[in-house]
């Protein structure tokens, strides 16, 4: 079997079938005056994404009540974040989270529904590929400022190999990312 046909034999699922996704809803929006320079609860925004990760040195913080306001946007290691406003479709994988964290508006928090059958790292790698951006550009709404709607994102098709294969694919792609980062430093 050649490489071009591999994904054809994998199960095809919709993103909404394999992941839960949540974002800060309108009435919960934070005012800039609520952004703190230090604290116990980090606030992650799309501008904190750097090369598929969160740059924790640039984040703001919020009060405990704003963190506790919505458990569905409290992020954890293994969460996948996708920007939905402005520069849409940027993807970050959460790891090495140093403290409790929540999201600002403009970012989806994705968590896999079944972590026995779906690898969050595999899903992250697939989402950061060109397929999501292509899909987003075809499906996004708005004029000069685009917006990615959740009802569109849930329809995004995901080729899903068996879990063991997902681990192999994500390990391979993670190693490539590490090599790219290493070469960019030199």
Where are these regions (language model features)?
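DNA target-recognition patches
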Residues: 16-19, 31-66, 110
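Structural detector for helix-capping/boundary residues
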Residues: 13-18, 47, 105, 130, ...
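A short beta-sheet element
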Residues: 45-46, 57-130
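A short glycine-rich beta-alpha junction/loop motif
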Residues: 84, 100-108, 141-164
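Short coil/turn segments at secondary-structure boundaries
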Residues: 28-34, 138-140
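Non-catalytic DNA-recognition/assembly elements of restriction-modification systems
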Residues: 3-26, 155
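Proline-centric
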Residues: 4-9, 109-119, 133-134, 151-167
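Amphipathic alpha-helical coiled-coil/heptad-repeat segments
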Residues: 1-14, 160-186
């Amino acid at each position: 079997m050649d490489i071009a046909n591999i994904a054809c034999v994998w199960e095809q699922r919709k993103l909404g079938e394999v992941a839960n996704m949540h974002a800060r809803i309108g009435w919960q929006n934070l005012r800039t005056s609520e952004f703190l320079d230090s604290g116990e609860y980090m606030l992650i925004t799309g501008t904190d994404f750097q090369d598929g990760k969160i740059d924790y040195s640039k984040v703001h913080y919020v009060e405990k009540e704003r963190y506790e306001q919505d458990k569905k946007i409290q992020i954890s290691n293994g969460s996948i974040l996708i920007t939905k406003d402005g520069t849409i479709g940027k993807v970050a994988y959460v790891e090495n989270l140093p403290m409790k964290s929540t999201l600002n508006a403009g970012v989806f928090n994705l968590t896999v529904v079944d972590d026995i059958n779906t690898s969050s790292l595999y899903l992250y790698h697939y989402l950061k590929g060109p397929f999501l951006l292509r899909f987003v550009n075809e499906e996004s709404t708005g004029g000069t400022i685009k917006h990615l709607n959740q009802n569109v994102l849930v329809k995004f098709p995901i080729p899903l190999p068996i879990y063991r294969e997902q681990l192999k694919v994500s390990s391979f792609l993670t190693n490539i990312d590490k090599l790219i980062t290493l070469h960019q430093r030199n």
